[in-house]
Amino acid sequence: MAKKKRKSRKKQAKQLNIKYELNGLLCIAISIIAILQLGVVGQTFIYLFRFFAGEWFILCLLGLLVLGVSLFWKKKTPSLLTRRKAGLYCIIASILLLSHVQLFKNLTHKGSIESASVVRNTWELFLMDMNGSSASPDLGGGMIGALLFAASHFLFASTGSQIMAIVMILIGMILVTGRSLQETLKKWMSPIGRFIKEQWLAFIDDMKSFKSNMQSSKKTKAPSKKQKPARKKQQMEPEPPDEEGDYETVSPLIHSEPIISSFSDRNEEEESPVIEKRAEPVSKPLQDIQPETGDQETVSAPPMTFTELENKDYEMPSLDLLADPKHTGQQADKKNIYENARKLERTFQSFGVKAKVTQVHLGPAVTKYEVYPDVGVKVSKIVNLSDDLALALAAKDIRIEAPIPGKSAIGIEVPNAEVAMVSLKEVLESKLNDRPDAKLLIGLGRNISGEAVLAELNKMPHLLVAGATGSGKSVCVNGIITSILMRAKPHEVKMMMIDPKMVELNVYNGIPHLLAPVVTDPKKASQALKKVVNEMERRYELFSHTGTRNIEGYNDYIKRANNEEGAKQPELPYIVVIVDELADLMMVASSDVEDSITRLSQMARAAGIHLIIATQRPSVDVITGVIKANIPSRIAFSVSSQTDSRTILDMGGAEKLLGRGDMLFLPVGANKPVRVQGAFLSDDEVEKVVDHVITQQKAQYQEEMIPEETTETHSEVTDELYDEAVELIVGMQTASVSMLQRRFRIGYTRAARLIDAMEERGVVGPYEGSKPREVLLSKEKYDELSS
């Protein structure tokens, strides 16, 4: 049923894509024919658009062209009522209105108006243009401009219509830019003001030098008159304070209102960037690999267990497979920013703390207020006011970052009323992602300032992801895997996935990047990790034979050897080991799993093997000290207590996160974590990417890396009392350590070992607290086995 549903969904999506492409091509064809005025059809469309927009008909044609390209490329109907587009409509309507006002001024001046009706005169001008009775007349703003002018002339007269058009242009600019008119004027006027000030100061310096030259020339001409120049000098001396007066007006620490940087504004500036597809290198088709003969000295190491040559026909998944972001306006949060800033300052003042809010960052999930304390104010004094500040702002909880790294300020993070969703597509579309060589670059989300947060897994080199159930941990892991699939081909990155929960990573079964099918049996997981350890040791043997130190050096060595000798030796791929739930593995085989993870985390970085370990139980018996010491990069989602936060990050803070993707990211080498709103990725998006990857290349699992079924083997019991103890327990049909101690007069340790050996061989059941163990072997069965 699931396959049928997936096929029907694919068929519907394909039909919808064809429909969008046809409509887009039709719009593009109409606009190009009309712009070039090709034949009768082109002239007809010109008349049609001139009727509506007059002399500005080209704007309609360009809009139709953009609409056609959008339908053809994005395969969806664009939203026509966004804030920016509403501003654009205001500007265009104002231009049409101004054009029509100017048209009727000219007609009135010439005396060409026969009727007082604006619409009728415009219609007559259009008919003259259609009939060709005169050279194509000026139609102003067309019929739209005529209707606007008729309404505005009735309400405001001609001059008032022009004023209203200018006001509408200003409103449109505010809507398009998303900034207040005051901010825009400040941005434009500040460089002009600086230029004028510099020129004025330069003019004052020139005047001073000119006056000093004049004084020196007068002294040389009249040396006998000494008093008069002295008087003049006294009159000229009071001028330098003008310079000081200029500097007194500058007070950078005094702000009437805090500077606000909005997350939504940053998103609109980055809206619909042009993403160029990476050009694949053009090369000849692969030839059959012939066994190398002769004394070739490329690699005389152990044989390659798994590597594959590049599939030239493989195409990377496009970003169009991911859903576009749906941003909320966060209008309520924007309105409350100034009020909250004043509340913070009043609260500080009431507790005798001199501090001022100077900058505010409106992020996706939280708003960060930058507070600059006065000289002599202790940081701890502000940190201790955490509960009082939360009470003043009526916030669920606040987090204080004291101080902000690189700034002499304290950050107060307040949850937003509306949480803006961050999509993986917008994170991967950022400029930071424009690095095709970084195969392990992963997208995490956006920080409070709205900047995309990406990280290179090979520089981490291992990652721990922990958080409570439902906090966004699985979505984060899916986002990391999808980021790698969007950037790397199967011969460049391989993956080993371990999923004891059996439902999170099963969707990736069949992708060509997998070394083995997703491991869902916890007993096989330790064996899979041991196979990765063996691969790491094999790689180090390769490095020692070739005289290289890491995977980058080895691959460069292979490239040089292939270029010089014409060989086809494949390069080593990176390996990413993903463990979705560490707690289950630690319950089944803690010692084996911990040993393998410890060895990999200590040594695997240079071999190109990287670990991503996720767990929803961040306790010390799961995230042991040995594991944590070797995994320096951590991501903490919302947890229930400060103890769990300290287990993950070695510091508090994660207990104050909001959930739903709100995380603290602590990269290697950083002193403090960065708060990030995680990128959301739906199940449908994951399925689309996986389907695309599978259609490009089928999975070829490596037999050496598939964990096998292991039969349990029991060593012989060396204790001579074992047979007698089994006979006693089967006869009594009850088993306990104390009974063996009494009957055989032995110590507790020896008796407990006998019971453990019986449990391994299925003679007795498991430990059940104060109750005696259940005897699983009947007396009749024992007699049969012994006879």
From Swiss-Prot:
A single BP term in Gene Ontology: cell division
Record flagged with keyword rRNA-binding: no
Domain FtsK positions: 450-646
Effect of loss of the gene: Cells lacking this gene show a chromosome translocation defect and aberrant compartmentalization of both sigma-F and sigma-E, and fail to complete membrane fusion at the end of engulfment.
Binding, ATP: G470, S471, G472, K473, S474, V475
PROSITE patterns referenced in this protein's UniProt entry, alphabetically: FTSK (PS50901)
Segments on the Cytoplasmic side according to the record's topology features: 175-787
Protein name per its UniProtKB record: DNA translocase SpoIIIE
Organism: Bacillus subtilis (strain 168)
